[in-house]
From Swiss-Prot:
A bacteriochlorophyll binds at H40. Keywords: Antenna complex, Bacteriochlorophyll, Cell inner membrane, Cell membrane, Chlorophyll, Chromophore, Light-harvesting polypeptide, Magnesium, Membrane, Metal-binding, Transmembrane, Transmembrane helix. The keyword Ribosomal protein does not apply. It comes from the Bacteria. The gene is pucB. This is Light-harvesting protein B-800/850 beta chain. It comes from Rubrivivax gelatinosus (Rhodocyclus gelatinosus). Pfam families: LHC (PF00556).
Amino acid sequence: MADDANKVWPSGLTTAEAEELQKGLVDGTRVFGVIAVLAHILAYAYTPWLH
């Protein structure tokens, strides 16, 4: 692993692999954010003590 010039320290991933992993992480965070916003809107709409 240390001999491969394409691998980036310390993860051992290539730049392309790291970018792919980061894209998945960002996409997952966006999905989580949308679900969280939707849950907060529904909680506000359906709980009378928040009005």
